[in-house]
Amino acid sequence: MNNFIEYFYGIKIDKVIYNDKYYSFIYNGFVYRLYIYNYDPRGVKFLYYTNRMLVGNTLMSEIIINKNNDILSSYNGFVYILIKIYANVNKVISLDEISFLSNSMYKENINVNWGMLWSNKIDYLEDLINENGKKYPLIVDSFNYFVGMAENAISYFNTIDIDSGYKYVVGHKIIRWDDTVEVLYNPMNIIFDFRVRDVAEYIKNSFFNNNYNIFDELVNYLRKNYLSLMEVKLLISRLLYPSFYFEMYEDILIDNKEEKIILDVISRLDEYEDYLGKVISFFKINYDIEEIGWLKKV
């Protein structure tokens, strides 16, 4: 891999470290990541355009062009993309960081339908469990509960009237509870979505990483960012959707991680329902939102 990097990028290094997602090395004091690119190559030009708009104005990691002036590099049957990291890879994610990045760029005239995406996701995961269920008893026992949560989220989303002309902002495909800001500034994790997408994911993650300051953070966030009633309803719908469980599900069935990783989730369901109830009560103070009947009253 050292020879590949030197040949395509003119970077001569002594040591490359590999983990299950990327190759990593340090050059001139900066961390670089070399990823296998598994996405539709037709989207790479927009990926690069967005990256150029964000690099310099934020700590967005920079896509490095190869010696052929191409974004992607092919080697031994795989396609790679190289990025240079500017953010502190050890810094924890905060709502302030999410807010800053969401205000850095927006896009109009796109269609984002969480309800349809979630419904398709459930169908896909149901097919997976039907094919592999015997090997994963913990998933089999818990799956219907989380599908029920997702269906509630879909029903709630489908009642929301989306404002025409909404400006979709920089968001992220996935933010896990143990991620650092490196994930926020990874160009391959960038999407354009409703402003509250990342806020909702942060709130959910705050439960699992025991962030006891979440309500103070929300007060501070709302002082700086006005949310419309529509956006708060979108946030609630996303809170109801158990993205964390479905991400772990795919980690287990697709990436072959141990099934026991979901124990920390399924063993705290009563606590989590209480937590969601408290979050929704927090927003009800200033917004006319409906009660969620199945959540515990707080």
Pin down the residues of each PLM region.
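Active-site activation/catalytic loop segments of kinase-like enzymes and analogous catalytic loops
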Residues: 195-228, 239-268
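ATP-binding glycine-rich loop module of kinase domains
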Residues: 21-45, 81
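ATP-dependent phospho-/nucleotidyl transfer catalytic cores
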Residues: 15, 112-171, 283-297
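Conserved kinase catalytic-core helix
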Residues: 86-119
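ATP/Mg2+ or Mg2+-diphosphate-binding catalytic cores
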Residues: 246-298
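A conserved alpha-helical element in kinase catalytic cores
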Residues: 37-76, 90-101
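ATP-binding glycine-rich phosphate-binding loop
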Residues: 2-29
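Active-site acidic catalytic loop and adjacent metal/ATP-binding pocket
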Residues: 24, 63, 155-199
